[in-house]
Regions:
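N-terminal beta1-alpha1-beta2 module of alpha/beta enzyme domains
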Residues: 1-21, 104
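Acidic (Asp/Glu)-rich catalytic clusters
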Residues: 6-15, 37-48, 120-121, 150-155, ...
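Conserved, mostly hydrophobic/aromatic
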Residues: 9, 40, 79, 119, ...
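Hydrophobic faces of well-ordered beta-strands that scaffold small-molecule active sites
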Residues: 17-21, 48-52, 106-110, 126-128, ...
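Glycine-rich anion/phosphate-binding loops
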Residues: 26-39, 244-249
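Short, acidic/polar
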Residues: 36, 110-118, 247-257
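An alpha-helical appendage that flanks or caps ligand/catalytic pockets
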Residues: 65-97, 137-260, 299
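Long, low-complexity C-terminal extensions of enzymes
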Residues: 239, 246-298
């Protein structure tokens, strides 16, 4: 359970931000999530956030469907009101009220234009998950701002974060294969992301390729093998959807992203593949602050 881990982290730390990156109403009731994150915030005041998303692989593997945009919007509204200490009508005998309410910001992780606009209408912050190509980042931020204007909100009030799949390795051949699998994973669920940069999928139908990849190109057990399935993808396409390579290379790529001119409040370097808990280390969570961030500060 993420909230057990977050509670331990809250007690043992004093500065880092804490929170689930992508919760989904398909897996937990929004009122339960509001209560859980408020409890964590009581242990780490002002250091928490609650991240929402439609859910994809996680809910599909549970036999459920991703959350619809309208459902996510309603869950976001309910959660924010509960965290603000308001009474909320929930079709029960009495309105619901969170008696230990805390002012925890609610973020939404989004890829598609409808979800991005919805996040702009109702979230405190938006985690944009579209890779690192400037055209995709720009289009995504424009969609968030459009949603904010639809709700008579100031776009500047909405914080922007980036989720960037990050392949930290000195083995550049391995990095090249995994980065291709990452690009295919974006095309698998969000093919519209190939349009702003002017990319073309020039290989077999993705549905045919998926028959040999489980559960998908982002979460395959062997990301090098899944990358070989899409070796036809160009370097430009592979480079557009992840940070990859040595600490020096990743620092340079991240510096480029932060130099596009957009105001970015937070970057989440999402490790790919997921680190093995039995690894002797140093692992991703140690290498990024010790090896990547110092290089970034030098640029």
């Amino acid at each position: 359970d993420p909230y057990v881990t977050l509670a331990f982290a809250a007690v043992e730390t004093t500065r880092i931000g804490l929170g689930p990156l992508i919760e989904t109403p398909m897996m937990r009731n929004p009122a339960v999530m509001a209560s859980s994150i408020a409890t964590v915030d009581s242990l780490a005041p002002g250091r928490t956030l609650l991240g929402y998303g439609v859910g994809d692989t996680a809910v599909r593997l549970m036999g459920k469907r991703p959350t619809r945009v309208a459902e996510l919007e309603e869950a976001t509204k309910l959660t924010r009101r509960l965290l603000a200490g308001e009474e909320v009508e929930v079709n029960a005998a009495r309105p619901a009220v969170l008696r230990h309410a805390r002012p925890v910001p609610v973020w939404i992780a989004a890829v598609g234009p409808r979800t991005l606009r919805m996040a702009g209408r109702g979230a405190d912050g938006v985690f944009i998950r579209v890779g690192r190509h400037e055209a995709n980042i720009r289009v995504a931020i424009e969609a968030v701002h459009q949603g904010a204007l639809e709700a008579d909100r100031d776009p500047a009030d909405i914080r922007i974060g980036l989720i960037l799949h990050t392949i930290l390795t000195d083995d550049l051949d391995r990095a090249a294969l995994i980065s291709r699998s990452m690009a295919a994973g974006y095309y698998e669920y969000s093919p519209m992301l190939f349009d702003p940069p002017g990319f073309t999928w020039n290989g077999p139908d993705i549905e045919e390729l998926k028959k040999d990849v489980w559960p998908d190109f982002h979460h395959a057990a062997d990301l090098e093998a899944s990358g070989r399935k899409v070796s036809f993808l160009s370097d430009d396409i592979a480079n557009a959807f992840s940070l990859f390579g040595t600490p020096e290379m990743i620092a340079e790529q991240l510096y480029q992203v932060l130099s596009f001119g957009h105001k970015i409040h937070m970057v989440i370097p999402h490790p790919m593949p997921t680190p093995n808990p039995s690894s002797p280390g140093p692992d991703f969570i140690e290498r990024v602050p010790l090896e990547v961030i110092p290089k970034l500060k030098e640029l």
